[in-house]
């Protein structure tokens, strides 16, 4: 889970991952108990140290826990705007991070400051519905939520678990020009951070020079293969089995 899992996934897919912490989590397969946000200064130092040291072909953004960290990320991505950027939009756990922190403020800052610089945002349909019910995004229909995210300037949005024909679930890609493409959902048993693995796989394809639709198509193929390799190591949720044995 988290950065170690992404690093293993990248290595298996033939990419060398470098990482920047945004928070340390006390966590097991059942859930998250505590989050300690990394200071934005440390996050900035680590990111720029790596970016100045070696060529980076693509970036994936995961959870951010303070608006200051979002601001730092926006400055970094603006300085390295030629690097493809994937933003994995996630729900902030219902934990007390800081008395002055509002999770909705972090998401709004991410929408306003970072999405305009992103090539792709990956988000689950259920999360979009939650944000709409809380007023973070307008309306109650999927198209309205997609339009709202695209209005922030992101080039494309990939929605997982989107409703299709009948009871079918799909992955829906919508770009800034209104062009849409659908794939069958990955399927399989529920797994922790399934969308995170998908976003990582897509990022590795962008790093190889693929355009967003092709990267999504190949990333979904990788995710489907990984969905056949899951296990339950503890008392909580299933996770991907990233070992080769």
What residues fall within each predicted segment?
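Glycine/serine-rich anion-binding loops at beta->alpha junctions
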Residues: 1-11, 190-197
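Conserved N-terminal subdomain of the carbohydrate kinase-like
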Residues: 3-101, 243-244
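Phosphate-handling active-site elements
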Residues: 14, 18, 181, 205-219
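Glycine- and other small-residue-rich loops at beta-strand/loop junctions that grip anionic moieties
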Residues: 61-62, 160, 191
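Conserved phosphate/ATP/ADP-binding segment of small-molecule kinases
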Residues: 100-179
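Short, small-residue alpha-helix embedded
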Residues: 130, 189-212, 216
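A short, charged helix-loop
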Residues: 178-187
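Charged C-terminal helix
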Residues: 213-245
